[in-house]
Amino acid sequence: QPFCGLPLDWVGRFNRDHEEAVYRCLAGVEGVPRWLGRVGELGYAIEHIRGRPLDHPPAPPPGFFDRLGRIFDAIHARGVAYGDANKRSNILIAPDGGPFVIDYQLAVRRRDDWPWPLRAVVGALVGYIAGRDLYHLCKHKRRIAPREMTAQEEAISRDRGGLHVLHRKLTKPYRSLRRAFLRRQHARGRLVSPTADLEDHYQPEKETWRKKEP
């Protein structure tokens, strides 16, 4: 839909092309849904994964986070950094207890086909974000399965890093404004999903703006 009269089709097209490139790069990696193809002018379809998000009880079975760690290792080995591992809702627990990682909109992939120094900059960014992926993985493990933690994982889960702390401080005003805007829109009934009847309405990540305005 247009925003302030400006067409935004190019944003949808960019997001679709970006995720397609990432999914194709990760084809065959265990725990990554399969790319199925484009749908319509801007849409696309991926493999349906039957499972529940990590932020839904009960806790995952023993060994879940070790398997998840191997998935992230495989993703990183393909030159892709996930970039959204802080959201538990992006990590699914399949009926057999195995992990799946979904939603690659924020993923960054290495671009060896780009000229230097662009490929060097992107490569450094991929390396940094991959490190943040491991930080969030270990943080989730510490909070959900602390008895399975190793000493190294414990250290990683506590190491936010200077850039991470700076990012949190700089974006705090934006997050507050965004949360207030979403809360107001939700109260006015403007954030109703077209697939609401098909959704699991236990969605903890949305509770910060689903609360009623004081």
Where are the model-predicted features located?
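Residue-level recognition of conserved beta-strand positions in structured domain cores
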Residues: 1-2, 37, 47-48, 103-104
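ATP-binding glycine-rich loop module of kinase domains
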Residues: 1-24
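Short glycine/proline- and charge-enriched loop/turn segments
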Residues: 2-7, 52-54, 115-123
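Conserved kinase catalytic-core helix
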Residues: 19-32, 52-105, 134, 140
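Short, electropositive alpha-helical surface patch
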Residues: 23, 50-55, 158-166
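Short beta-strand micro-motifs within the conserved protein kinase catalytic domain, predominantly
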Residues: 33-43
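Conserved short submotifs of the Hanks-type protein kinase catalytic core
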Residues: 41-53
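C-lobe/activation-segment region of protein kinase-like
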Residues: 94-210
